[in-house]
From Swiss-Prot:
Alphabetical keyword list: Cyanelle, Membrane, Photosynthesis, Photosystem II, Plastid, Reaction center, Thylakoid, Transmembrane, Transmembrane helix
Lineage, uppermost ranks: Eukaryota, Glaucocystophyceae, Cyanophoraceae, Cyanophora
Pfam families in the record: PsbM (PF05151)
Subcellular location: Plastid, Cyanelle thylakoid membrane
Gene Ontology terms: biological process: photosynthesis, light reaction
Species whose genome carries this gene: Cyanophora paradoxa
Name of the gene this protein is made from: psbM
Family: Belongs to the PsbM family.
One cellular component term from this protein's GO annotations in UniProt: cyanelle thylakoid membrane
Protein purpose: One of the components of the core complex of photosystem II (PSII). PSII is a light-driven water:plastoquinone oxidoreductase that uses light energy to abstract electrons from H(2)O, generating O(2) and a proton gradient subsequently used for ATP formation. It consists of a core antenna complex that captures photons, and an electron transfer chain that converts photonic excitation into a charge separation. This subunit is found at the monomer-monomer interface.
Protein name per Swiss-Prot or TrEMBL: Photosystem II reaction center protein M
Transmembrane segments: 5-25
Keyword Nucleotidyltransferase: no
InterPro entries: PSII_PsbM, PSII_PsbM_sf
């Protein structure tokens, strides 16, 4: 089975970019919520 490097990179980016975007949004939401509590 031949692995296509470009396909592998594209798949990795396709998974990593939305995941990191959601993580950043989540962290910002939690941080702002903690600031509002104080």
């Amino acid at each position: 089975m031949e692995v296509n490097i470009l396909g592998l990179i594209a798949t990795a980016l396709f998974i990593v970019i939305p995941t990191s975007f959601l993580l950043i949004l989540y962290i910002q939401t939690v941080a702002s919520a903690k600031q509002q509590e104080q």
